[in-house]
Amino acid sequence: MYTKEYYWFSQYMIITSTLVLTIIWSILPSSLGEAAPKQFINTLLDIFPQRRWIITLESIMLMGMLCTYIGLLMYNEDTLTPPLDSLSTVTDAGGQLVIEDDPDVFVKKWAFKETSGIYDLSLMDACQLLYLYDNDHTST
């Protein structure tokens, strides 16, 4: 029943302990091996890779992560972001635009009345209503 939780917890513990052990192994000075018993040091040297390889692999992984983050940022900005003149930057796919050819009919019928959430005004019409027309149309 709880096998996934145990799996993820054990994976987290193994990865975290490996990371901590690798960082400690790469930071420890070489003179520390002289104070410890030779049997223990020889066993560790057989298990762990050389210190130069650990630092090299850490550097390669860090540069790989940096390139991945920069690549994802560029992909998001170039591919996933819609252009500024696209209608999807203002409305969503569920929006229904009100289109009237005559501006006076549009103003009288749609501009200053509630849309009840069924129709959306286009961006140009909203800008015209806010900044171009006088407040004289509000009395009609």
From Swiss-Prot:
Topological type in the membrane: Multi-pass membrane protein
Lumenal-side segments: 34-52
Enzyme Commission number: 2.4.1.198
Topological domain spans for side Cytoplasmic: 1-12, 74-140
Gene Ontology annotations for the cellular component aspect, listed alphabetically: endoplasmic reticulum; endoplasmic reticulum membrane; glycosylphosphatidylinositol-N-acetylglucosaminyltransferase (GPI-GnT) complex; nuclear envelope
Membrane listed as a keyword: yes
Record field: transmembrane: 13-33, 53-73
BP GO terms, sorted: fungal-type cell wall organization; GPI anchor biosynthetic process
GO MF annotations in UniProt: phosphatidylinositol N-acetylglucosaminyltransferase activity
Catalytic activity: a 1,2-diacyl-sn-glycero-3-phospho-(1D-myo-inositol) + UDP-N-acetyl-alpha-D-glucosamine = a 6-(N-acetyl-alpha-D-glucosaminyl)-1-(1,2-diacyl-sn-glycero-3-phospho)-1D-myo-inositol + UDP + H(+)
Keywords assigned by UniProt, alphabetized: Cell wall biogenesis/degradation, Endoplasmic reticulum, GPI-anchor biosynthesis, Membrane, Transferase, Transmembrane, Transmembrane helix
Localization of this protein: Endoplasmic reticulum membrane
Pathway: Glycolipid biosynthesis; glycosylphosphatidylinositol-anchor biosynthesis
Pfam families cross-referenced by the UniProt entry: PIG-P
Role according to the record: Part of the complex catalyzing the transfer of N-acetylglucosamine from UDP-N-acetylglucosamine to phosphatidylinositol, the first step of GPI biosynthesis. Involved in cell wall biosynthesis.
Note: Present with 752 molecules/cell in log phase SD medium.
Subunit structure as annotated in this protein's UniProt entry: Component of the phosphatidylinositol N-acetylglucosaminyltransferase (GPI-GlcNAc transferase) complex composed of at least GPI1, GPI2, GPI3, GPI15, GPI19 and ERI1. Interacts with GPI2.
PANTHER family hit by this protein: PHOSPHATIDYLINOSITOL N-ACETYLGLUCOSAMINYLTRANSFERASE SUBUNIT P (PTHR46346:SF1)
Similarity comment text for this entry: Belongs to the GPI19 family.
Name listed for the protein in its UniProt record: Phosphatidylinositol N-acetylglucosaminyltransferase subunit GPI19
Gene name, Swiss-Prot/TrEMBL: GPI19
